[in-house]
């Protein structure tokens, strides 16, 4: 019999990504715009947030704190962040742990000029670089892997009397992993993306200035017009005079993280030319072709699975119904001390609509199964509401491998599909049948030649270092 942990968050189905970044150059009240931009990226991180602004005199000021954007900032705090240039960050930690000291943007003082830094992703050789830098005398303010990049920049600036962009290029070429960085100095922002293109970063035009964001959904909110994506292996220098491009790596691949399309990004965002909602809807259509079910209605798990459920319903000819309702106001990190309290917590977050599902054979569409515990609870909710059959269809391949690029799955033990076959997983979640989308269909849904699908296939686009490599080689249980 499978036993669930006694202490477990009710929102344990949710994957958490490293964060989201947003920046503004050459626009009045840049901090206010950054506030709205971060609010649009809140789904990428709820643990903490921060903004650093640059005044007309070149002075940098920072406000950061734990909680949501609306909890950390108010009019008085934003008024203290005057200037036409700012960067911001929302955080959901996957490396370095929590605590205010790990909330970005980080702010660094240097005799060549202060600079601020915000990062989305994960640096897989951070521990090796940190040890190297500490042996060279670097003192770290946090346990975040992101701070490693800043110390590499400072080291290169100290050793070479040349423009900062060259120090950034040298530092970037020492990093391995997934990253979208914003580095802000007194008069410009450098937008940098890893050479594999694992994390998104886009540039927009607003009046005489520019904005840069992890997702394009933030552009419409602030009134900006999409210009282009930052390319893999590229540094885009953005100042009050315009934008300039430099390549720091000749090796480039467009290996966007598949989970950006499947789960993390907002449906109204476009990632490398493909709308997220359209991607998910097409994945649902292809899922029906690969795994049809003899059923009466299609129900999606809110919110990230709804687009795929629409596609499955259209392809199958079955009615799409709102058989599950999500309570958006439940706390984010409830941890319940007993089984009965956990069950109440799940019912607070998700409710089944018995008038819709009672007496029906349900196709339940979800974007992914990671740990499996919440899938089992949802199947149980539908059965208790009167569903006669529950056929689970997953709009992604089986999640079998840890991610080391900014998603909080670092061991095989926590992954259901690493421990169980599909029939075993089906029995565990209590479904009548279970099927997944194939990797080929996932690529087809996005009109892509390649994506990072390491969590599905085990084919990692970068080298894995130290303890991470050893963890990856562990025998699967």
Predicted regions, residues:
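Mobile, glycine- and charge-enriched loop segments
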Residues: 351-365, 369, 394, 465-477
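A conserved beta-strand->alpha-helix junction
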Residues: 73, 142, 147-151, 320-331, ...
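Short, glycine/charge-rich flexible loops or terminal/linker lids adjacent to PRPP-binding catalytic cores
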Residues: 317-362, 373, 400-407
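Flexible loop/turn segments at secondary-structure boundaries
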Residues: 29-31, 94-95, 125, 190, ...
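Secondary-structure transition/capping motifs at alpha-helix termini
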Residues: 138, 159, 292-296, 314-321, ...
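PRPP-dependent phosphoribosyltransferase catalytic core
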Residues: 172, 187-188, 223-229, 380-477
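Conserved short alpha-helical segments that host acidic/polar catalytic motifs at enzyme active sites
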Residues: 2-232, 237-295, 301, 389, ...
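Extended, hydrophobic alpha-helical segments in both membrane/secreted and soluble proteins
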Residues: 298, 305-312, 316, 320, ...
């Amino acid at each position: 019999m499978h036993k669930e942990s006694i202490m477990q968050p009710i929102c344990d189905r949710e994957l958490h990504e490293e964060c989201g970044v947003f920046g503004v150059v050459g626009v009045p009240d840049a901090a206010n715009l950054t506030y709205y931009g971060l609010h649009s990226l809140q789904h990428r991180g709820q643990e903490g947030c921060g903004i650093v602004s640059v005044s007309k005199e070149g002075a940098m000021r920072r406000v950061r704190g734990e909680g949501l954007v609306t909890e950390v900032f108010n009019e008085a705090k934003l008024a203290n962040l005057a200037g036409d240039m700012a960067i911001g960050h929302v955080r959901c930690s996957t490396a370095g742990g929590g605590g205010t000291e790990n909330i970005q943007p980080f702010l660094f003082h240097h005799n060549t000029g202060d600079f601020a830094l915000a990062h989305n992703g994960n640096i897989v050789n951070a521990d090796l670089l940190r040890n190297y830098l500490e042996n060279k005398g670097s003192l770290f303010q946090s346990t975040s892997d992101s701070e490693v990049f800043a110390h590499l920049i400072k080291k290169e600036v100290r050793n070479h009397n040349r423009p900062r962009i060259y120090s950034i290029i040298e530092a970037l070429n020492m990093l391995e992993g997934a990253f979208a960085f914003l580095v802000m100095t007194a008069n410009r922002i450098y937008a940098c993306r890893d050479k594999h293109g694992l994390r998104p970063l886009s540039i927009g035009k607003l009046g005489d200035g520019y904005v840069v964001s992890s997702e394009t959904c933030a552009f419409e909110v602030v009134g900006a017009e999409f210009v282009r994506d930052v390319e893999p292996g590229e540094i885009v220098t953005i100042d009050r005079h315009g934008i300039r491009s430099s390549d720091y790596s000749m090796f480039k691949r467009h290996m966007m993280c598949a989970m950006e399309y499947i789960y993390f990004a907002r449906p109204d965002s476009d990632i490398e030319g493909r709308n997220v909602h359209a991607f998910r809807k097409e994945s649902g259509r292809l899922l029906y072709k690969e795994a049809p079910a003899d059923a009466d209605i299609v129900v999606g798990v809110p919110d990230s699975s709804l687009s795929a459920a629409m596609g499955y319903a259209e392809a199958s000819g079955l009615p799409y119904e709102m058989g599950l309702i999500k309570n958006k106001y439940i706390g984010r990190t409830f941890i319940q001390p007993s089984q009965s309290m956990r069950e109440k917590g799940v019912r607070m977050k998700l409710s089944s609509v018995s008038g819709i599902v009672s007496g029906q054979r349900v196709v339940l569409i979800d974007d992914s199964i990671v740990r499996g515990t919440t899938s089992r609870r949802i199947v149980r909710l539908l059965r208790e509401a009167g569903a006669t059959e529950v056929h689970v269809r997953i709009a992604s391949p089986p999640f079998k491998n840890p991610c080391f690029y900014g998603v909080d799955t670092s061991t095989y033990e926590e992954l259901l599909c690493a421990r169980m076959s599909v029939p075993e997983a089906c029995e565990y979640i209590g479904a009548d049948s279970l099927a997944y989308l194939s990797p080929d269909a996932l690529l087809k849904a996005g009109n892509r030649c390649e994506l990072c699908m390491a969590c599905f296939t085990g084919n990692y686009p970068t080298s894995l270092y130290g303890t991470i490599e050893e963890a990856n080689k562990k025998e699967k249980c």
